[in-house]
Amino acid sequence: MGSISMHITPSTALPIRHFRARVSCCSSGHVSFIKDVAATEPPMHLHHLLKVLQTRGETIISPGAKQGLIPLAIPLSKNSSGSVTALLRWPTAPPGMDMPVVEVWRSGVRLIARNVDEYIHRILVEEDAQELTELYRASGEAGEKLYEKGAFAESEIDNLDVYVLKKVGLFPDLLERKVLRHFDEGDHVSAMVTGEFYTKKDLFPGFGRPFVYYANILQKVGRNVEAKDAARVALRSPWWTLGCPYEEVASIAQWEDEQIEFIREKVSDEGRFEDLHKGKAPIQVALDVAAFLLDLASIEGTWSESLNHIAKCYEEAGLHHISNFVLYTD
């Protein structure tokens, strides 16, 4: 289908040295890390998700093993191909996206599930469709709460993806697969309707990927002006949420390097002074610079080189806990 692609799968904390002894690769280590280092409430069923991931063959890794990754990620597991599943700790979370499950890659993250519960639920449905039970047993009380075994078969819904979207939740890869299915059937109208639905602001807030995908759809059907507009909307989101290299989206948006140069100017001392001179609040300037630095690091793959500068911005914005979290590595 041309360029459309799928990838399945935004008070001062204690000194960081106080946390190291508490962090381990077990679920209690992840829970304490999220409470003490990430300074937020861990998902209720995180322990059960880790057990499920381990049971299906993934290696549970330390939440502090963030070297080379976007600093907002909390690693959970690594699969046999080296792909890392993580939680995303937003500095300021969009509504309904407090701690989504993501796949981490060089230039940022790809959204897997909006929350831990929906991810567990989906995994259990997909296992049940194969008439297996190992992951359900591993999920413990979370599985009993989230899914009743046999519900998929009893629903008489033939298509597993349709069941998950109706009964479990919305997942980016399933919506993208639905678009592909419509194109395979020659139904371009339904493909475009699904693509537009994917971009609804309350579905996956904070993520640019839906608009990238919609731009590809529009380009596929020859609506290049609308594709350009959709790509430009995508680039208003954090660039590390695009799900593909920045250059691919900038090409559809018909932008050269001017946007990158604009961002570089914004993070310079002169750019910060200019924003302050225009009356922007110092806290907002610091938050903007941190966001711009993350954008630039996602293009250049230089997360480690930007850590201190990003952390300093969050410190200046009064987000001391985020500053400590960003700097933390095992």
From Swiss-Prot:
UniProt keyword Plastid present: yes
Entry GO CC: chloroplast stroma
Residue interval of the organelle targeting sequence: 1-35
InterPro entries for the chain: PAB (IPR045287)
Coiled coil location: none
GO BP: chloroplast proton-transporting ATP synthase complex assembly
Superkingdom, natural source: Eukaryota
Null mutant phenotype: Severe growth defects, and inability to flower and produce seeds.
Protein name per its UniProtKB record: Protein IN CHLOROPLAST ATPASE BIOGENESIS, chloroplastic
Organism: Arabidopsis thaliana
Underlying gene: PAB
